[in-house]
Amino acid sequence: MAMNKKIAVVIGLSILISGCSSANKEKNYNFIKGLNEYQKNDKVSALENYKKAYEIDKNNVVLLNEIAYLYVDLGKYEEAENYYKKALEVKPNDENSLKNLLQLLYLQNKRTEMEKYIPMIIDRNSFVYNLNNFRLGILENDEDKVEKSLLKISSNDKFLEEYNESFYIDLASVAGLSDNTIKYSNIIFEKAYRRYSNKNKDIVKIYANFLIEIKEYRKAEDILMKYIVNNENNLDEYVLLKTLYTKENNKQKLENLKKILRNKK
């Protein structure tokens, strides 16, 4: 799941640490203890302490999201779903709860559930709303829905506010769906590449893969070569170059690449 733990901790502390009653103090103590255990990767102890805090305050949206997030980390998706839904019962239309729940539903191919919760997103121009309609289109194999969602995403830079790797992987997966999906995906990838490529290797690889799939070989080669020149740890990029040259049957460049790789050993 793509939730930022550092942000969650800051928000959690600011919301949970309130009041001075003994019950509040006990809740805060258990929550902070749970956070500390989680940071040490002791997920079982973290969950135990979160649950103690939950027994004191069952209506805290941040705490409910933290418990759900931990259940996802433990691979217990049904339990996670339940806690995200509890958070939405307390605070309907909470975007963070909806975002995390919809991500989880998508991972499990739960289309009917996604259809239920997507309309609860208030801002119809938000990235979260358009992202989940795009994903629903993928699950339903609905080319029109995919195209319309990508058009909206590509026309608004909100998707750049937070790096979402799973979105770019999904984007690359629909490369061959239609000319329009290629057009809109290209716009999105170009913006993401400009924003993230200096500090994020993964966007370079995903974008290059996309370009190779749509047979934009020279453009793919260009971004891979730029990365290789500026970075030492670049074996993955060499592998992608090999894939590229193999697909376009460029025997001369393949031979040159083999020589470079032999010299790197």
Task: State each model region's role.
Residues 39-40, 73-74, 104-108, 139-142, ...:
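Register position in tetratricopeptide repeats
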Residues 63, 97, 129-131, 163, ...:
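TPR alpha-solenoid repeat register
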